[in-house]
């Protein structure tokens, strides 16, 4: 009997400590300054704390994403710091949808500002013929579907979640409009088939299959004629919540994914692709 009581006590204490750890992590995030207010030096002090507190990479990325909720929204605010786009290579004071995903991933891979900037270059730019990633407007991953099917840091897992026969697809030449002209002046195009999860397959059962954090890219069929597949991207955490930089909200928000995706007036998108964030690539 004494042994049983001891085992029960150990079990209760273990459960209590686990609960307290979860609460502690949430409260710890609340004690941090808002990331959009921090200087580079303050980021140097903060990023190592995430490394120490969340040694698991996916857990660290998830909590960095949560920390960034509230970041002011501004679109197209990442650049190369040279003409034609003088915006900074990395920043945390404002964000748009792609900016949120990539700068959060860069932070999760890094222990200081310089590391984050260098990692952002690896995430946001294509290698040249010598394998060197040199930031330029033309070498940037401009198209989300191109990035998640070719960049080893953000890897498409759509076909591992839903059988290929149940997916929708589009054959498309990225960056080429119906009249054959380029959408962006890149001297580049790519012909590909994109497979995506149609709306009727986006269900609680699908959400239950997801890892603790994944990327989600939103398909916009009316953009196909412009050589574009995606209209938005964000993160899904815990198989339930969307964290994304929202233009309508004017900031980064966390909300129920299925409620966001299926509003009363009907879905805004034609499907989704799901991708993983990789620590090492």
Task: Please name every model-derived segment.
Residues 213-214, 232:
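Structural motif
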Residues 219-281:
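C-terminal soluble interaction/assembly domains
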């Amino acid at each position: 009997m004494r042994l049983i009581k001891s085992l029960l006590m150990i079990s209760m204490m273990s459960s209590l400590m686990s609960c307290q750890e979860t609460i502690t992590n949430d409260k710890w995030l609340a004690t941090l300054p808002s990331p959009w207010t921090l200087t580079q030096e303050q980021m140097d002090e903060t990023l190592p704390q995430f490394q120490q507190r969340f040694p698991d990479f996916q857990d660290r990325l998830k909590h960095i994403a949560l920390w960034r909720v509230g970041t002011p929204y501004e679109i197209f605010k990442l650049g190369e710091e040279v003409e034609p786009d003088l915006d900074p290579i990395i920043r945390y004071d404002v964000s748009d949808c792609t900016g949120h995903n990539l700068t959060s991933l860069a932070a999760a891979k890094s222990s200081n500002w310089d590391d984050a900037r260098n990692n952002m270059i690896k995430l946001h730019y294509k290698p040249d013929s010598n394998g060197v990633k040199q930031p330029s407007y033309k070498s940037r991953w401009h198209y989300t579907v191109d990035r998640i099917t070719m960049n080893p840091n953000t890897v498409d897992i759509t076909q591992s979640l839903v059988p290929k026969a149940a997916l929708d697809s589009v054959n498309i030449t990225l960056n080429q409009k119906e009249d054959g002209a380029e959408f962006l002046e890149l001297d580049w195009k790519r012909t590909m088939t994109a497979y995506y999860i149609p709306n009727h397959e986006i269900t609680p059962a699908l959400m239950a299959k997801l890892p603790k954090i994944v990327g989600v890219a939103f398909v916009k069929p009316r953009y196909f004629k412009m050589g574009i597949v995606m209209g938005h991207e964000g993160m899904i955490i815990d198989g339930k919540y969307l964290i994304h930089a929202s233009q309508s909200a004017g900031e980064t928000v966390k909300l129920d994914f299925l409620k966001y995706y299926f509003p009363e007036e009907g879905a805004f998108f034609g499907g989704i692709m799901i991708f993983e964030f990789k620590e090492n690539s």
